[in-house]
Amino acid sequence: MSRYFGTDGIRGRVGQGLISADFVLRLGNALGRVLAQGRDTRPMVLIGKDTRISGYMFESALEAGLVAAGADVQLIGPMPTPAIAFLTNTLRADAGVVISASHNPHDDNGIKFFSAMGEKLDDATEAAIEAAIEAPFLTVDSEYLGKVKRTRDAIGRYIEFSKASVPRGFTLRGLKLVLDCAHGATYHIAPMLFRELGAELVTIGVDPDGLNINAGVGSTHLETLAATVRESGADLGIAFDGDGDRVLMTDAQGRTVDGDDLLYVLARAWRASGRLKGTVVGTLMSNYGLEQALGTLGIPFIRARVGDRYVHQALVESGGVLGGEASGHLLCLDRATTGDGIVSALQVLEVLRHEGLTLSQALLGLHKVPQKTVNVCWSGPARAAVEMPEVRQALVEAQAAVQGRGRVFLRPSGTEPVVRITVEADDVVLMQQTLDRLADVVRDAA
């Protein structure tokens, strides 16, 4: 088991445990040493971040650790996570680092890495970095210290990359959209891009102050977006999370359109156009109704472990190009190397424009079963919850209660100190009763 890395890098409360300036300094030094092994030239690393205030502190710590190990650094500043993945590849860097805690509040932060190809690091490289952290801090001789510079054209590069993901003649003229940028990393780029494509925009969540990221806005708080869509008469709403790798939408009536819905819209249209390849990949949490709807269309569907890195792995293994999670992590591997909220939103909008459909019309063939998830806070290691006898027994009873009519999942979060409980069933009362009973047992055991 990894000592430091979770399902999406390293994440936690600022100033506690691993999310401290001294640890991040050592982490940067470890990365620099791993990248320098077996080469005569200095490795080059990109560093990007979201808008939370602690990003400045960790950016400086990473920079110092990398430079001390002899690595050059390019500072990108506030940019979406997928933009760092793209820039790492296109600028021929040896690695990319993102300072972000995604959809978490401002007092959390985290570090995630990308390979030279703009993909999440493999387990072997993560293990090498962890081993290097335990070694003494390295400062190379002065003449071999790394250099630091800022990249000035990152925004323009990423906007052109995103626009290139849709046909050249594609425009959004005549569409009124509400964009919710979560006061996060997309706050400046997303409005610029969608206006360049001709959309009439109403924007929310575009005034970051370092403390308001994800605060009542973004993909985890769709209430503001839904209300703004209804009040403004917009055609639909688009919400990103704090680092821009997730996207959710609302239709013109303000109804939530989650990642499962968006997967269906894309899979159905791409199959008809011939763009869909291989298998569509969801996760263990994907709604059963999605699996049924895709099956009706003759589209193969498999489930990976929860986490976009596992969806990516399953897509590569199955030769697929489309996958994702209900949370809004969508992978369009024929357009981007990682989950990209802006690129994914453009793919959905391109389908709607091509087919002449509204978002609600594009979803008419999907009938999801009632599903609900609750998070139960867990003071100790969340993984211990699933091993407790009373919790295991309650899980068995819950699964028996919905057998043949739904599914029950209980899993520790890979990014937060919570246990996630999900129940789906063909009857909403059965679903809620089963969820309540299981959640009560987990809370009592916490």
UniProtKB/Swiss-Prot annotation:
Its EC number is 5.4.2.10. Activated by phosphorylation. NCBIfam families: glmM, PRK10887.1. The modification Phosphoserine is found at S102. It catalyses: alpha-D-glucosamine 1-phosphate = D-glucosamine 6-phosphate. One of its GO terms (cellular component) is cytosol. Keywords: Isomerase, Magnesium, Metal-binding, Phosphoprotein. It holds the Pfam family PGM_PMM_IV. Binds 1 Mg(2+) ion per subunit. This is Phosphoglucosamine mutase. Catalyzes the conversion of glucosamine-6-phosphate to glucosamine-1-phosphate. Its cofactor is Mg(2+). The active site is at S102 (phosphoserine intermediate). One of its GO terms (biological process) is peptidoglycan biosynthetic process. Mg(2+) binds at S102, D241, D243, D245. GO terms for molecular function: magnesium ion binding; phosphoglucosamine mutase activity; phosphomannomutase activity. PANTHER family: PHOSPHOGLUCOMUTASE (ALPHA-D-GLUCOSE-1,6-BISPHOSPHATE-DEPENDENT), PHOSPHOHEXOSE MUTASE. Belongs to the phosphohexose mutase family.
